[in-house]
């Protein structure tokens, strides 16, 4: 009995030490100055009804999305595209004081029917990444909708041909996914495609080399953080915006998450 009590006491002490260490560590992170850089937000659907229950957690209802844009405007953020970012990288332009990039993965039809009108009402822009082999299918945009979206100032990017994690593919398969999607979009009448979103945010060294070969200029990951003009343009940080359970409070937390991980990288 005494041995069990001793083991329990030791476990409690270890847990207390761990909690205290964690609290001190987080306090140190909070005390650090805000790092330079801008966030890239990762959205998927903007609708009252997600494609299916599996995707519900990635859906932001229209009223919540509008409230998030209101918050960004009220706090001085200006949306930019990743082409704007690269122009600044090459000294051909400058970024506004508080830039932010809104990205939308997959190419859902509600991006055109619901998201775009809300975005335009706020005089904002975005980058939309499409899975080319899904275009025209149920719940996805058509070619004409995609072209109209680009004509209205939205940057269009590739989310590969089939949305297969590149880390699970052979070198030749990665090359196909990266090149086929870009060429298909450009051959179908869209302006040059310069950006790619890695499926599931997973990056490979081979993919980065293929992106360079195919004249992509940027690519976004699933890793949270902030981006600067010195950030590797093929490994840009993004923070995922999920269906909010706590309204703007959760959205603010997501913005802070990008800052928090940027602070961590500055330490390590």
Language model: regions and residue ranges:
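Short beta-strand and adjacent tight-turn residues that come in two discontinuous sequence segments
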Residues: 129, 159, 219-221
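Substrate-binding clefts and substrate-entry loops adjacent to catalytic sites
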Residues: 157-172
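Residue-level marker for buried hydrophobic side chains located in beta-strands
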Residues: 102-103, 156
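C-terminal active-site subregion of NodB/CE4 polysaccharide deacetylases
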Residues: 2-13, 18-102, 108-110, 168-268
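Short histidine/acidic/glycine/proline-rich micro-motifs that form metal-
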Residues: 132-136, 165, 199-202
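Charged helix-capping and loop-helix junction motifs
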Residues: 139-146, 173-177
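Acidic (Asp/Glu)-rich catalytic clusters
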Residues: 116-123, 141-158
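A short alpha/beta connector and helix-capping loop motif
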Residues: 112-132
């Amino acid at each position: 009995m005494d041995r069990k009590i001793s083991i329990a006491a030791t476990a409690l002490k270890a847990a207390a030490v761990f909690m205290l260490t964690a609290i001190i560590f987080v306090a140190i992170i909070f005390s650090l100055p805000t790092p330079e850089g801008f966030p890239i937000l990762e959205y998927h659907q903007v609708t009252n009804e997600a494609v299916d229950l599996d995707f519900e957690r990635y859906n932001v209802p229209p009223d919540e999305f509008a409230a998030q844009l209101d918050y960004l405007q009220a706090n001085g953020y200006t949306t930019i595209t990743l082409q704007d970012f690269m122009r600044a990288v090459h000294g051909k332009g400058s970024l506004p004081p508080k830039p932010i990039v809104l990205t939308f993965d997959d190419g859902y039809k509600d991006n055109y029917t619901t998201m775009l009108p809300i975005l335009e009402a706020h005089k904002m822009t975005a980058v939309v990444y499409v899975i080319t082999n899904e275009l025209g299918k149920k719940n996805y945009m058509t070619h004409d909708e995609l072209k109209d979206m680009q004509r209205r100032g939205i940057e269009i990017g590739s989310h590969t041909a089939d949305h297969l994690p590149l880390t699970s593919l052979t070198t030749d398969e990665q090359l196909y996914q990266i090149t086929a999607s870009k060429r298909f979009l450009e051959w179908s009448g869209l302006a040059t495609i310069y950006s790619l979103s890695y499926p599931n945010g997973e990056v490979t060294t081979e993919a980065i080399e293929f992106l360079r070969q195919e004249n992509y200029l940027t690519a976004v990951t699933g890793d949270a953080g902030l981006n600067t003009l010195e950030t590797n343009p093929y490994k840009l940080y993004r923070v995922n915006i999920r269906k909010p359970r706590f309204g703007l409070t959760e959205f603010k937390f997501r913005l802070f998450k990008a800052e928090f991980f940027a602070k961590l990288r500055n330490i390590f």
